[in-house]
Amino acid sequence: MTTAKRPLALLILDGWGYRENTHNNAIFHANTPVLDRLNAQYPHSLISGSGLDVGLPDGQMGNSEVGHINLGSGRVVYQELTRISKAIADHEFEQNPALCDAVDSAIKAGGAVHIMGLLSPGGVHSHEEHIEAMCRMAVARGATKVYLHAFLDGRDTPPRSAKSSLSHFDDLFTTLGHGRIASIIGRYFAMDRDNRWDRVSQAYDLITQGKSKFQYDNAVTALEAAYERNENDEFVSSSAITDADGQVATLQDGDALIFMNFRADRARQITRSFINPDFDGFERAVVPKMHFVTLTEYAGDIKAPIAYPSENLVNTLGEVLQKQGRTQLRISETEKYAHVTFFFNGGKEEPFEGEDRILINSPKVATYDLQPEMSSAELTDKLVAAIESTKYDVIICNYPNGDMVGHTGNFDAAVKACEAVDACIGCVVDALAKVGGECIITADHGNAEQMTDETTGQAHTAHTSELVPFVFVGRDATIDEGGKLSDVAPTILTLIGEAIPAEMTGKPLIHIKE
């Protein structure tokens, strides 16, 4: 007979930061009686999820991938943004073997170098400085046909801010004497991660066939036309950009295609559409035989050269739990499932022994402000059942609402999202109390606490650099101040009576009173 477990649950409230300023602060304005009560009754503090504390450049806002890697690994992990920017500054980037091979193969075949990625200074999924370095390197190596397929942001940047980036790259190509912007499309289409293949297919057809809803002779003109159609950057319809002869640039046999996003979750689907021989997400009219390179590792089953392979993280929380014969559950909606599994496990796809996973489908709506509660009720039902089963030592759960609805810029919807999560937490805490369990409530980064850009007056759809909550609902304890996300895994191990491995440099934040 299996011994009943007294589970320790880590509840990650995605996009839930703390901000003193209450103006357009959806979390402050939401009615959250459960969290209010827990903060009044139990020890709590604020911890850091941004900048140097998570291995990002100083002042850089945190994000979900980075947050979960730090949460699960128990150490500050040097992030891809910093790593690649350093390689560019040190002139190592221009000698990267995978990138050089791709450019050289296209030149040798008489083909073109196609560069695609999120053209943004946001630093969450990509950085336009990396894309510029790639364009410069391609031309320096002798490429005369260099085509940029720009995915537009408006989510980790202000909703209408792409013009300066497009103008800069127009000027860059003029200076280089070769290359041009070949297409633009919003990230809503090109970077879907929820198996909405009808969106991804529009980006694929744009790049491979030049098939587009609109066609212009200049990228800035195309963007301005999109704004006239009331499309913000994120939602810009497929737009092919023609050359002086009215021709579009499409991916052909013998070309190279270099994907410049460094974050994996929103890069996987479109990558698979280009390289998987048995791909069945949508009908591909053409499948060019080309040299495809990814900037970083997107998934174990994606077989393509990688410019910057992942650094191997050992003795993450999941691995330590496995070694100690502990059971664990990972649970979230589609939107954050990769975060509580792949990213939390330090970039490992396969579950650890004793690790179960539950995926709840996110609602099929165009944007989550249309259903701010998302699938939180179903998620909570499954989570409560798992707690009551007493099968698990540790449960990792992510509620995506604060982040996913925060990204829409819709204040009223974000308030509803926060209220939905609060009600769910009440159910979870009650279930834990029944079985003698405990929980830590925290977040990976901020978002919903700032819904308007105080400078521009536009909707603030990006993450923030605010501190995030850290609450312990359990035994009588004290909590250290000044913590960061990498302190969470060591804290969990201490609470369940396991030793902290040497690889974890984080410190336990919770101290049980004797």
UniProtKB/Swiss-Prot annotation:
InterPro entries found in the cross-reference section: Alkaline_phosphatase_core_sf, BPG-indep_PGM_N, Metalloenzyme, PGAM_B_sf, Pgm_bpd_ind
Residues at which substrate binds: H125, R155, D156, R187, R193, R263, A264, D265, R266, K336
Binding-site residues for Mn(2+) 2, renumbered to this chain: D14, S64, D444, H445
Listed pathway(s): Carbohydrate degradation; glycolysis; pyruvate from D-glyceraldehyde 3-phosphate: step 3/5
Residues where Mn(2+) 1 binds: D403, H407, H463
Keywords: Glycolysis, Isomerase, Manganese, Metal-binding
Cofactor note: Binds 2 manganese ions per subunit.
Catalytic activity: (2R)-2-phosphoglycerate = (2R)-3-phosphoglycerate
MF terms (GO), sorted A to Z: manganese ion binding; phosphoglycerate mutase activity
Names of the cofactor(s): Mn(2+)
Active-site residues annotated for this sequence: S64
Biological process, per Gene Ontology: glucose catabolic process; glycolytic process
Superkingdom field: Bacteria
Keyword Acyltransferase attributed: no
Enzyme class at the top of the EC tree: isomerase
EC number: 5.4.2.12
Keyword Manganese attributed: yes
NCBIfam families for the chain: pgm_bpd_ind, PRK05434.1-5
HAMAP family found in the cross-reference section: GpmI
Family: Belongs to the BPG-independent phosphoglycerate mutase family.
Subunit details: Monomer.
Role of this protein: Catalyzes the interconversion of 2-phosphoglycerate and 3-phosphoglycerate.
Protein name per its UniProtKB record: 2,3-bisphosphoglycerate-independent phosphoglycerate mutase
UniProt source species: Shewanella baltica (strain OS195)
